[in-house]
Every structure is written in structure tokens, then in C-alpha cells.
Swiss-Prot record:
Amino-acid positions noted as binding ATP in the UniProt annotation, renumbered to this chain: G30, E31, N32, G33, Q34, G35, K36, T37
Entry annotated with the keyword Repeat: no
Family per similarity comment: Belongs to the RecF family.
Protein known as: DNA replication and repair protein RecF
Domain of life: Bacteria
HAMAP family, sorted: RecF (MF_00365)
Organism field: Anaeromyxobacter dehalogenans (strain 2CP-C)
A Pfam family recorded for this sequence: SMC_N
GO-annotated biological processes: DNA replication; DNA synthesis involved in DNA repair; double-strand break repair; SOS response
Keyword DNA damage set for record: yes
Length: 372
């Protein structure tokens, strides 16, 4: 699905933007702090209904404005669809072809055909940072693969909050009543993540070998569940094992007022040559591993959807060494995908530019076309 046109109003520092992107590469040029990332976030928000950065929704509204709005026309096999989302004091509302979600349009219909993958400098820290970032990567990638994950993850968070509150102040009976919905939602999320990792692992190995060469150690990916929960079983058995882990840890959880087993405590393990890349990989190897992981995600979606996802690359080239940047740009140039790239230095992305590349300058929230 291609983004044909984009309208942004009062989103972050963007007062009013009308964009006609290229069907291939659209490059956003400008100094830091001018609004390039905000424009990428507007596209990401439109395609996922979630902010790119962890903020309150109210922070997406431009200072002094009453609300923010993003809308786009997407062309796919079924024709052109218009999706839109608005953020105001009352929260977030979205619509498909003018029909609000929940009253004329379904969430599944909204997300049909919409898939976007974002790659930012923060992602390059994925290997050596804490597990929170790796869990966010998993859940965002799982949502792209199966949009129903959005509702499933929300169900798990609600159940987790309820059980944690019961652990702190409720009776044993109250805690037990919240445990079953937590187990059900947790097992569903565990299985989604497990299945995603199984799909990504061989693609990661292939991409890393291509980036790093035949002499490099083999890359691998594994899902590590907290509390000793083994996830290599049917969903019902995973649920039973999660329930046993919660029962075993019940007294400890009561003392701490916190659930210590479940998807919110799990981790994604990236390895090189059988050793954890977080401890044993060099910075160059870690960055190559993250690049391979992103390519694995893109290729996995390409295989599942029959086309590549929309790509959002936020100044990644400035953080990669020349060899890895050449590899990334060569990959993008060969991929039949629509991509949006931000940069402060046009020279860094020139190898990926083609005759149909669109260039825009972003300055103080104003987006203006440039002659290529």
C-alpha cells in the first residue's frame, strides 16, 4: 500500500503540512530540532495509532492548539482509502473513509494493508540497552505482523494492573479472581512473540551473514520467558505453565506488590556464535546485528503481506559506519518499497536516491519541496 498524500495539522511543531510523497523515496532534509522526526512520527501514528516515542497523547498537540490531526490517502489492491486520526483533550479518534472507528468502521478494516517499520538511532542501542526496549521492539513487530496484537496487549496490561493492585491491597480471593484473565492474555501474548521470533531468526541469520561476511560468527535470536516458563508448547500448555509460575511466586509477589512472571518481564536474546551479543559483541557487531534484525522484520512482513511495509528511517545513516550505510542504502535502493528518510546531510543518503526521489526541506516545522 502506497501513501499518496499526507495532511498534518498542529502535530508536535508542525502547524500545517501537505505532502505529496514519492512512491519510492522521500527525503526530509534539515538541521536537528526542525521537525523531521515529527513528520515521521505523524506517519507512524497514522499507521499504528501509537506515538513513535513514549509520551502522553496530549504532548502530540502543538503548543497553543486545541487538537492535532493527521490524514492520509493510501492506495492498495482495493483502491484508495483515506485514514485519519485526531488527538484532542478527550483522547484519540480515528476514521476510515470518513467513518469513525466503532461507529461505522472496524479497527481491523482500518489496519488492513497498513504496516510501517521505523528505524531510528535509538534502535542501534537495542542489543546493549535494557530489556524494555527489546520488548517494545517485539510488540511493535508483532503488531505489524498481526494487528490483533494491539487489543491483546491492551487486555494483558489491564489484567496485569488489576492483579498488581490486588496483590497490594486485596485478599487472596481477589488476587485469584484476577489471575485467570492475566494467564489467558499472557499466554496469548507469549505465543505471538514466540511465533514472531521463530519467523525472524532465520532471516536475521541470513541478513547478518550478508552484512558481516562469511567469517563472522553466526547470529541467532531467542525468546527468554521469565519465571522459567517454557514457551515451546501449544497455547493451552503455555497458559498452564504461566499459571504454575504465578502460583509458585505468589508469596514473593505479595510481598513486593508486583507480578514477577509474564510477558512484561521477558526478554529477547540476540547472540553471536552462541554467546550473548550484549556482553560479548563489539559495538560494530551489535550495530550490524540490529541492522540485520530490522531487515529481518522488513523481509518477514514482505513475505507475509506480499509486499514490503512502509519504511521510516530517522537519520540512521549518520550513526552507521560507511560500510554498513552502503549496505543499508543498497538494500533500500533494490527494495520495491515506499520509504521516508530524514537526514541533516544529503550526501549520506544519495546512493539510495533515484530519479523519482522527492526531496523536502524541514525548517521550524515548515515543510517545503526542493528541486532534486
Amino acid at each position: 500500500m502506497k501513501l499518496l498524500s499526507l495532511h498534518v495539522q498542529d502535530f508536535r511543531n508542525l502547524a500545517a503540512v501537505e505532502l505529496a510523497p514519492s512512491p519510492r523515496a522521500t527525503v526530509l532534509l534539515g538541521e536537528n530540532g526542525q521537525g523531521k522526526t515529527n513528520l515521521l512520527e505523524a506517519i507512524y501514528f497514522l499507521t499504528t495509532l501509537k506515538p513513535l516515542r513514549a509520551v502522553r497523547l496530549a504532548e502530540l498537540v502543538r503548543f497553543g492548539a486545541a487538537d492535532a490531526a493527521v490524514a492520509g490517502d493510501f492506495e492498495g489492491p482495493g483502491g484508495v482509502r483515506r485514514v485519519a486520526v485526531q488527538v484532542a483533550a478527550g483522547g484519540r479518534t480515528a476514521s476510515l473513509d470518513g467513518k469513525a472507528l466503532g461507529s461505522g468502521a472496524r479497527l481491523d478494516d482500518y489496519f488492513e494493508g497498513l504496516a510501517s517499520v521505523c528505524f531510528s538511532p535509538d534502535d542501534l542501542l537495542l542489543v546493549k540497552a535494557g530489556p524494555d526496549g527489546r520488548r517494545r521492539f517485539l510488540d511493535r513487530a508483532a503488531f505489524n505482523r498481526w494487528p490483533a496484537v494491539l487489543g491483546e496487549a491492551r487486555e494483558y496490561v489491564r489484567a496485569l494492573r488489576a492483579r498488581n493492585a490486588a496483590l497490594r491491597s486485596g485478599t487472596a480471593e481477589v488476587e485469584a479472581s484476577f489471575r485467570e484473565p492475566l494467564v489467558r492474555a499472557g499466554a496469548r501474548l507469549l505465543v505471538r512473540r514466540r511465533d514472531l521470533v521463530a519467523e525472524l531468526a532465520p532471516r536475521l541469520r541470513a541478513a547478518f551473514a550478508e552484512i558481516s561476511g562469511p567469517a563472522a560468527p553466526e547470529a541467532d535470536l531467542a525468546y527468554r520467558a521469565a519465571g522459567g516458563v517454557e514457551v515451546g508448547h501449544p497455547e493451552a500448555e503455555v497458559a498452564a505453565r504461566l499459571a504454575r509460575a504465578l502460583e509458585t511466586r505468589l508469596e514473593r509477589d505479595r510481598e513486593k506488590g508486583f507480578t514477577s512472571a509474564g510477558p512484561h518481564m521477558d526478554d529477547l536474546v540476540l547472540a553471536l556464535g552462541g554467546k550473548g551479543a550484549r556482553l560479548y559483541g563489539s559495538q560494530g557487531q551489535q550495530r550490524a546485528l540490529v541492522l540485520a534484525l530490522k531487515i529481518a522484520e522488513i523481509e518477514n512482513l514482505r513475505a507475509a503481506l506480499g509486499r514490503p511495509p512502509l519504511l521510516l528511517l530517522d537519520d540512521v545513516s549518520s550513526e552507521l559506519d560507511p560500510a554498513k550505510n552502503r549496505f543499508l542504502l543498497g538494500y533500500l535502493a533494490a527494495l520495491p518499497a515506499q520509504a521516508f528518510l530524514t537526514t541533516t546531510d544529503r550526501r549520506l543518503i544519495e546512493p539510495a536516491a533515484g530519479p523519482d526521489t522527492a526531496f523536502y526541506e524541514v525548517r521550524s516545522g515548515v515543510v517545503s519541496p526542493l528541486v532534486s
